Amino acid sequence: MPELPEVETVKRGLAPTMEGALLVRAELRRPDLRFPFPENFANAVAGRRIIALSRRAKYLMIELEGGDVIIAHLGMSGSFRIEKGPIEAGADPATPGAFHHPRGKDEKHDHVVFHLDGGSGPARVIYNDPRRFGFMDLARRSALADHVFLRGLGEEPTGNALDAAYLATRFAGKIQPLKAALLDQRTIAGLGNIYVCEALWRSGLSPKRSAGTLVDKRGRPKQALIALTERIRAVIADAIAAGGSSLKDHIQADGSLGYFQHSFSVYDREGEACRTPGCHGTVARIVQAGRSTFYCPHCQK
């Protein structure tokens, strides 16, 4: 599933084509994705100019003039691609947000087509989703904080609001395993399995450790929590700079792959040597709450 860096990469890839363009028509090729489209969705967005693209957690936000926002989630296999100019057979489109190594975009899975008119001429932004776990919704910008998909989300790992003092308030007294606490979207919005594993390895912290052990008796963050916060922010920044992780379906807006997977230190490296200097441990895989966790039992305590 696309995580925050992948969705950020998709947003940045789509923005040059979509921002400022007129959304001439929304072509829905089926009545639903994971959920039904909102009633009158196509008519509601047609003829509106796209003001900006933004992101909240793992959600792509397409902001329209007039105060409406299209909320899009890529699910497990969703991707966008851009086709520019007149429709021509055999055109080679750019792919702004898939997710594995190059995979053919079977047109039978093209479920939504946004027909645009921008400064460089007509374009089509096509949403392709073989498994149909993605979805789209339409909401008023003024009501986003209370939207069912967005309310209760925690701080973004890319902003200054995520600091050790904030995490201390969330972790104090918790016996919950550290990995589970970090995956709680009410604490950190958009942080997923891959990057939690990597941040914990960089911090030398076991995913099985109780979250509350990183907070002192006065509720203040211990040095380990301060370091963990810095590592979380760093691993997300590194992944965004690399264009995400090409694990299952993620491809950048220009069709190239994300390359952060080449920087994985523990994720998906079960049985391989730990990359911590001086550590002679081996990366292990365990299952926590139904999710694979990769870590080094030797150096992560």
Curated annotation (Swiss-Prot):
Cofactor(s) this protein requires: Zn(2+)
SUPFAM superfamilies: Glucocorticoid receptor-like (DNA-binding domain), N-terminal domain of MutM-like DNA repair proteins, S13-like H2TH domain
Residues given in the record as DNA binding sites: 109, 131, 174
Entry EC no(s): 3.2.2.23, 4.2.99.18
Zinc finger (FPG-type): 265-301
GO process annotations (BP): base-excision repair
Cofactor: binding details: Binds 1 zinc ion per subunit.
Residues at the catalytic site: 2 (schiff-base intermediate with dna), 3 (proton donor), 58 (proton donor), 291 (proton donor)
Keyword Metal-binding belongs to the record: yes
GO molecular function: 8-oxo-7,8-dihydroguanine DNA N-glycosylase activity; class I DNA-(apurinic or apyrimidinic site) endonuclease activity; damaged DNA binding; zinc ion binding
Chemical reaction(s) catalysed: Hydrolysis of DNA containing ring-opened 7-methylguanine residues, releasing 2,6-diamino-4-hydroxy-5-(N-methyl)formamidopyrimidine; 2'-deoxyribonucleotide-(2'-deoxyribose 5'-phosphate)-2'-deoxyribonucleotide-DNA = a 3'-end 2'-deoxyribonucleotide-(2,3-dehydro-2,3-deoxyribose 5'-phosphate)-DNA + a 5'-end 5'-phospho-2'-deoxyribonucleoside-DNA + H(+)
Keyword set includes tRNA processing: no
Keywords: DNA damage, DNA repair, DNA-binding, Glycosidase, Hydrolase, Lyase, Metal-binding, Multifunctional enzyme, Zinc, Zinc-finger
InterPro entries in alphabetical order: DNA_glyclase/AP_lyase_DNA-bd, DNA_glyclase_Znf_dom_DNA_BS, Formamido-pyr_DNA_Glyclase, FPG_cat, MutM-like_N-ter, Ribosomal_uS13-like_H2TH, Znf_DNA_glyclase/AP_lyase, Znf_FPG/IleRS
Entry similarity comment: Belongs to the FPG family.
Protein function: Involved in base excision repair of DNA damaged by oxidation or by mutagenic agents. Acts as a DNA glycosylase that recognizes and removes damaged bases. Has a preference for oxidized purines, such as 7,8-dihydro-8-oxoguanine (8-oxoG). Has AP (apurinic/apyrimidinic) lyase activity and introduces nicks in the DNA strand. Cleaves the DNA backbone by beta-delta elimination to generate a single-strand break at the site of the removed base with both 3'- and 5'-phosphates.
Subunit structure: Monomer.
Protein known as: Formamidopyrimidine-DNA glycosylase
